[in-house]
Amino acid sequence: MIYEESKMNLEQERPFVCSAPGCSQRFPTEDHLMIHRHKHEMTLKFPSIKTDNMLSDQTPTPTRFLKNCEEVGLFSELDCSLEHEFRKAQEEESSKRNISMHNAVGGAMTGPGTHQLSSARLPNHDTNVVIQQAMPSPQSSSVITQAPSTNRQIGPVPGSLSSLLHLHNRQRQPMPASMPGTLPNPTMPGSSAVLMPMERQMSVNSSIMGMQGPNLSNPCASPQVQPMHSEAKMRLKAALTHHPAAMSNGNMNTMGHMMEMMGSRQDQTPHHHMHSHPHQHQTLPPHHPYPHQHQHPAHHPHPQPHHQQNHPHHHSHSHLHAHPAHHQTSPHPPLHTGNQAQVSPATQQMQPTQTIQPPQPTGGRRRRVVDEDPDERRRKFLERNRAAATRCRQKRKVWVMSLEKKAEELTQTNMQLQNEVSMLKNEVAQLKQLLLTHKDCPITAMQKESQGYLSPESSPPASPVPACSQQQVIQHNTITTSSSVSEVVGSSTLSQLTTHRTDLNPIL
């Protein structure tokens, strides 16, 4: 009973219980509980030792870091744009014949059916340009409707669209912030002159809107949007990450609808990203300020062969990067009827869309060059290292050879000096021996005495015989003394030579 009462009191005092597994602590306030949960989140969760005796090694090595990056998709996001563009360029080269066949089939169709040959694949930056053009327009959601077969005028252009276009193309002429409210009659021949500094954005947007045409005009095509909903979301997310400034004015629904239409059309026409159909300008949005972006009547199929003939001509001009204003300032002459004069500016607008495509294989080549650059740099670096090592070895070899030659010369001079020293030692020993033999010699003293005795002044009167005997004794004594002196001198010279040798040894 006491235990139950204490438990109830504890529950009343601390009503907040930790929900972590294996933890049943209680806390009086929610703040304490949040701090406790944060501690749980910060602790490492190792597996139980009973089930797994070996703890998993979670050391952050470079290999695991690269593996995690591959799992997340970091490297694929960096390289997907170049690979995708290069793949599209290859598909373009392999599907030229299919495009001509689809164009022939599209010539027999009228109305919304002609939009099925519109461009479906564009580079990532062009798609983002279209999103930037369409989003700031508050009327864009009301414009994407079924295209009627009559001509109509286009409304005023918002200032945010022109500012976005001006920011996107700074290298061209500046675009004013306000556009004319109404447009002239599209049936006039003078309206074929195209003066568009932002022709690339307009053409890309026209191709995208033409791509949306059949889905919007045909109610039966709307279920095709649902299977591509996830892909459209992915494309929308990628576009938002590249251009976060485009999220303005609350047009997320319009942009999502456009991306869904793009995703549905990409599966239907995957190989038509180079030859946009000339009739794609039927469903242009109202914020295009140029006179030829009107709706073309759907009951004129006779200009179709002419446009099919003009396709190779514009394809031949697709690589003219140095002349972007080839069809911008010069008016296109009227060909057969007023309708053909109205369609020809659309073909002129198609050319910048085509000029966007050729840099795709160059991007692939640039990537291959980037891939080859590290190997080339490493090869040159190794060559420089080898050359430097060779030069260093050569210098060291010359230095060692010079040292060896110098050592040989020094050894020869040392041997010569040693020979001279030994000769000088012998001479010194001989001279010392002579000095010792002749220093205080008794012979000289006896000779002096004998000479003194033999002289007539000092010699006695009668002593010849003892003198002779005395001379013999002196000679015998000198012989014995000389032998003894020579022995003494020899011993002394040997001792001196040994001492002198020890003195000369440090020099050697």
Swiss-Prot record:
Biological processes annotated in GO: positive regulation of DNA-templated transcription; regulation of transcription by RNA polymerase II
Q: Which domain of life is it from?
A: Eukaryota
Gene Ontology annotations for the cellular component aspect, listed alphabetically: chromatin; extracellular exosome; nucleus
What are the boundaries of the region Disordered?
265-391, 449-468
Stored PROSITE patterns? BZIP, BZIP_BASIC, ZINC_FINGER_C2H2_1, ZINC_FINGER_C2H2_2
Q: Which residues carry this modification: Phosphothreonine?
A: 59, 61
Q: Where is the composition biased (Basic residues)?
A: 271-280, 289-326
Tell me yes or no: is Zinc-finger among this UniProt entry's keywords.
yes
Q: How does it assemble?
A: Binds DNA as a homodimer or as a heterodimer with JUN or ATF2/CREBP1.
Instruction: State the protein's name.
Output: Cyclic AMP-responsive element-binding protein 5
Gene for this chain: CREB5
